[in-house]
């Protein structure tokens, strides 16, 4: 179902989009679902908050697009950018976490360490990667009320633009490391079990980019501790494709328990998400994240999934179902990506906040995060 596309919820974004004029028309999908469980709209007298999560594989252009966006909008009290917590990853939470991750995968690929040894390091490192997102989500959650939709919904008093959602470190990158052989499926599901409930108004922007161009962009950028790992690039691209398909599968009525028997344990190529697919056909379960977990390690002797792992897949379905999904085409200039993102905000869903002081507290929280852990 379309998420009330066309409402100008973010006037600052809307003004910038109008000023930028048309680009080549490559925008993204409208949201594929409007959260049905947000009947409690909150106090209509309280202001609204818009949260935009820019996510997807590393190197696709997320940070560049966000920087272009913030530059176009200029300094504002009502829009705050929440960057990746690089200082936490590299200094505060542990020393050189990214270097440790890439070196561990490299050593595994060269046969210098076993898969079990790599999994211990990767699981520990992924805890470090996920901590800032999980903590921030927890302190933000009490301020988020019900979704504010309809013609009476006021423009947001505050917009937060996040560089990644918690699912990046609690789902997508663990799953990619599993595909790379450096994390167990049990460890991936342990992270999934820790995914926080999805708050109303979660606007998730994923992206598509041809793989050759993606590899070229990744080779050109300089990030502390990063190696150019084309196998990992392929794995994380696949996981994000599966994520988009899974959200659409759930929102179009797919039920993983009913379809589980269709899985054979042999993974097929995953269709890329279509940026224009706003209300298409039901994806196959074979093309979703659920297919990754039809593996012997998770199955009882009779071939059924152990109940404990099935419960975790129920958690996965519960967390992904309410998300408002957008897909941005990054195969254009940074300005083109920025303008496409600006146009998308008209269809995004804000929420009421829960107290009169919430906007000020949220703004302070976001700025504290950026100042304390958002360095390079």
Swiss-Prot record:
Q: Where is the active site?
A: 84 (proton acceptor)
**GO molecular function of the protein, one example?**
thymidine kinase activity
Which residues are recorded as binding ATP?
Answer: 56-63, 217
Q: What is its EC number?
A: 2.7.1.21
Task: Tell me the superkingdom of the source.
Answer: Viruses
Binding site residues for substrate: 102, 126, 223
Enzymatic reactions: thymidine + ATP = dTMP + ADP + H(+)
Query: Which InterPro entries does the UniProt record give?
Result: Herpes_TK, P-loop_NTPase
What are the UniProt keywords, alphabetically?
ATP-binding, DNA synthesis, Early protein, Kinase, Nucleotide-binding, Transferase
User: Could you tell me the Gene Ontology terms of the biological process aspect for this record?
Assistant: DNA biosynthetic process; TMP biosynthetic process
Q: Where is this region: Disordered?
A: 1-45
Q: What else is known?
A: Phosphorylates and thereby activates certain drugs like acyclovir (ACV), valacyclovir, and famciclovir to a toxic form, that leads to successful suppression of the infection, while the uninfected cell does not have this ability because it lacks TK. Mutations in thymidine kinase may induce HSV resistance to antiviral therapies in immunocompromised patients. The most frequently observed resistant strains are unable to express TK and are avirulent in animal models of disease.
Could you say which protein family the record assigns here?
Belongs to the herpesviridae thymidine kinase family.
Q: What does this protein do?
A: Catalyzes the transfer of the gamma-phospho group of ATP to thymidine to generate dTMP in the salvage pathway of pyrimidine synthesis. The dTMP serves as a substrate for DNA polymerase during viral DNA replication. Allows the virus to be reactivated and to grow in non-proliferative cells lacking a high concentration of phosphorylated nucleic acid precursors.
The entry describes its oligomerization and partners as:
Homodimer.
State the name under which the record lists this protein.
Thymidine kinase
From the UniProt record, report the name of the gene that encodes this protein.
TK
């Amino acid at each position: 179902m379309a998420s009330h596309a066309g409402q100008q919820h973010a006037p600052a974004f809307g003004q910038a989009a109008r000023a930028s004029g048309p680009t080549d028309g490559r925008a993204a999908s409208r949201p594929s679902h409007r959260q049905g469980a947000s009947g409690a709209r909150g106090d209509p007298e309280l202001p609204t908050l818009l949260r935009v999560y820019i996510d997807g594989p590393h190197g696709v252009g997320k940070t560049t697009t966000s920087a272009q966006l913030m530059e176009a909008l200029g300094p504002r009290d009502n829009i705050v950018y929440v960057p990746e917590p690089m200082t936490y990853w590299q200094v505060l939470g542990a020393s050189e976490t990214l270097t440790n991750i890439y070196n561990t995968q490299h050593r595994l690929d060269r046969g210098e360490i076993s898969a079990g040894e790599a999994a211990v390091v990767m699981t520990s490192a992924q805890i470090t990667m996920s901590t800032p997102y999980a903590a921030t989500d927890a302190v933000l959650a009490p301020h988020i009320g019900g979704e504010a939709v309809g013609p009476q919904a006021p423009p947001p008093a505050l917009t937060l633009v996040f560089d990644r959602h918690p699912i990046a470190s609690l789902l997508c990158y663990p799953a990619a490391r599993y595909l790379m052989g450096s994390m167990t499926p049990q460890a991936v599901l342990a992270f999934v079990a820790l995914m926080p409930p999805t708050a109303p108004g979660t606007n998730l922007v994923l992206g598509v980019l041809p793989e050759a161009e993606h590899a070229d962009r990744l080779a050109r950028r300089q990030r502390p501790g990063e190696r150019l790992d084309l196998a990992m690039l392929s794995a994380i691209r696949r996981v994000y494709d599966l994520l988009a398909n899974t959200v659409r599968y759930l929102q179009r009525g797919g039920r993983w328990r009913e379809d589980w028997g269709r899985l054979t344990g042999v993974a097929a190529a995953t269709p890329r998400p279509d940026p224009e697919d706003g209300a298409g056909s039901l994806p196959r379960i074979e093309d979703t994240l659920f297919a990754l977990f039809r593996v012997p390690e998770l199955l009882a002797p009779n071939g059924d999934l152990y109940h404990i792992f099935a419960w975790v897949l129920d958690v996965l379905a519960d967390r992904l179902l309410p998300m408002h999904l957008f897909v941005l085409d990054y195969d254009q200039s940074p300005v083109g990506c920025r303008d496409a993102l600006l146009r998308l905000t008209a269809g995004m869903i804000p929420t009421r906040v829960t107290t009169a002081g919430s906007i000020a507290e949220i703004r302070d929280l976001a700025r504290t995060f950026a100042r304390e852990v958002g360095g390079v």
